[in-house]
Amino acid sequence: MGKLQLRLLKHTDRVELDHYLRLYSRSFNPDERVSTQILRWVIQPSPARVNPVHLFAAYSDKQLVGGACTLVLPMFQVVFGSYIFVAPALRGRGLGAKILREVLRQERKGVHGWNWRLYGEVTASSGDGWHKLLARAGFRFFKKMWPLASYQHPNRIVPGRLCYFNFRRPPERFSQPALLTYIHALFYGPETMHRHLLPRLKHFVKLEA
């Protein structure tokens, strides 16, 4: 395949966005994918939206081969990498690693690149190979289970692992417990966060950096 190109989509890129969201939907099981309606909504510019969402489309020879979705959290100087995906028919060719490297490069270019960090989640459906690839790329994993709530069945918990990558150095005055409770409540709702994350939060308090 040709050289990989990663493009940041805008809400006005209607055709490209339609193709992206169809591939995104095919790449994740219902428990782990947020609805495409929500993704369409959150990439629309709004003065009230303080946490920008980046939808990156990955192309090779003008063919859409995968993508990524990140959430930028200026309050915590963090980028949260919610999704990286490759077209099912093209997996096993190293495209996931190329997309990951390009996401890190592009997020590092921004004004936040000096001292921000990027977080990511993995689950059993990510595959052991993806876990190992992230570790080789420089991501560090927390030892304890990270509880992801199912988007299809809110009372179901999907066991995951949380990891992070430092762009340069840790942010100043960084509060990891506040960040993780905020992210969990944002993604899954306050009730789920109180029920499933707070009892485990002590395992994520110590900054492993």
Name what the model sees in each region.
Residues M1-I43, A57-Y59:
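Short amphipathic alpha-helix that is part of the acyltransferase structural core
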Residues G2, L9, K109-A209:
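Terminal substrate-recognition subdomain of acyl/acetyltransferases
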Residues H19-L23, K98, E102, G129:
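Alpha-helical elements of Rossmann-like donor-binding domains used by nucleotide-donor carbohydrate transfer enzymes
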Residues Q44-A57, G66, R156-I157:
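A short helix-loop-beta-strand connector motif used in the catalytic cores of GNAT acetyltransferases and
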Residues P45-V50, R105-N115:
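Alpha-helix termini
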Residues H54-F56, Q77-V79, I157-C163:
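Short beta-strand micro-motifs in enzyme catalytic cores
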Residues A57, Q63-V72, V78-F85:
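Conserved beta-strand in the GNAT
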Residues V86, G92-R108:
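Conserved acetyl-CoA-binding loop-helix of GNAT-fold acetyltransferases
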